Amino acid sequence: MNAMKTEQVRQVRRAALAAGVGAVLVVGVLVFVPDKDEGSPPAAGPEARALAAADAGAPASPADLTALVHDKETRVREHPADDQAWAVLGSAYVESGKRRADPAFYPKAEQALRRSLKVRTAARGNTEALVGLGALANARNDFATAKKWGEQVGARQPKQWDAYPVLIDAYDGLGDYPAAGKALDKLTKLRSGTQVLARSAGVFRTRGWREDAAAKATEAVERATSPTEKAAALHELGELAWERGEPKEALAHYDAALQAAKDHHPSLAGRARALAALGRTDEAYGAYQSAIARLPLPEYSLELGELYDAAGLDGDARSQYAALRSQVARAQRNGVDEELVLGRYESDHGDPQAAVDRLTAEWGRGHHSVEMADALGWALFRAGDATRALPYATKATDKGPLSALFAYHRGEIERTLGMTGPARRHIDQALRTNPHFSPLLAPRAREAREALGQPAAGGPADMSGDSGDTSAGTADTGTGGAPGNAAPPGAAA
């Protein structure tokens, strides 16, 4: 390469770092495609690495993400009319909030993204800010709004690849799994690499295609280009092993993830779950406490509370449930919808009717995921309405992944309704899938299975689920969105 060309490349690199999101593609090329004549380029700074990761669809390291936030905060103070810098800053705030489980970042993200659109509207091509708003809505569990923003980008710029991860998450949250699959198809036509593999693994796992999901996650580990990418893919393998009822294998994947990136805090929680299943309870307490200290998510507090509950440590359990309520309240103040985890808590440890009211309202807002169906069905059961509960439990088990928790919930509902054969089949399924699925509920599942006994002569018909009273499976769950009038599970799934 001659001197003039070398200097031109250096000038482009400097311009790219100054320009922000509009130069993300350039940064990606400069960082990941070294010039063969000149040798490898100088090591990129943290801001450039974070931008390059964003271009690749990859997670930036926490340190690089923090550096990017500081860089863009400085940029917009000095250049308040830079719509692209505002869009990058807003998206970086969203990612920071997710990585730290700190919802206080989300109002700041919304302000930055809307400022970007004020400077340059979507009609004038500012689709980057719309993608950021979609990611923000997903982070707040506002999936209908995320769908709106993602579809706007898809309509304006159908080849803008980063709209499709937003749409996949939104459709999953709404329970529109065919649409999520179509969004993944579009993404794979536009992009390749580790993050597309990771997205594929997630979609396949949601559909219950575990072998396909594991194959994609394994390939993502092999092709990872950063420790953070590798840790995320290893964590996915850990989750798949956990769901299969293999805590020892899951623990190995979580440990490998933490070895790759010690700040991959979700793997700390996964590690705690696996340790508890292996009987290493004291270690599990410590791992959960470390995870919650670094990533204070209410679902982790619920898991630790239930682990304490199972051990008879009522005071410690109450402390965790209080922490959960505090975490949910803080999230809600910052626009995050945490009704699902709060409903799960209320069903088993608080007021089941309050859980019914909360989750029925969520269903009325179009949140028809299998997780929501399972939670609403269980809340109805715990509130004494097994007949209305069964259609929701059926949706969760029939349309979702092979989940031990979902199968147990359905089995208990069927047992209450006198549907002995189906109850036996689903509780058996729960214990075969993952005998350690919950420190609190797995022992109850074993007790229920023992109480059900063995099938009588002619057992195959009994075990098929066709015998017994099946009329409850067609119960009318109503037509509206108000509490007590949720739409039937099959109506808009």
Where on the chain are the PLM-derived regions?
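N-terminal leader/linker segments that initiate helical-solenoid repeat arrays
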Residues: M1-T121, G125, P435, P439-A486, ...
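Solenoid-like repeat scaffolds
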Residues: R77, K118-T121, Q152-Q157, D185-R191, ...
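Residue-level recognition of tetratricopeptide repeat
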Residues: S91, E95-K98, A135, D169, ...
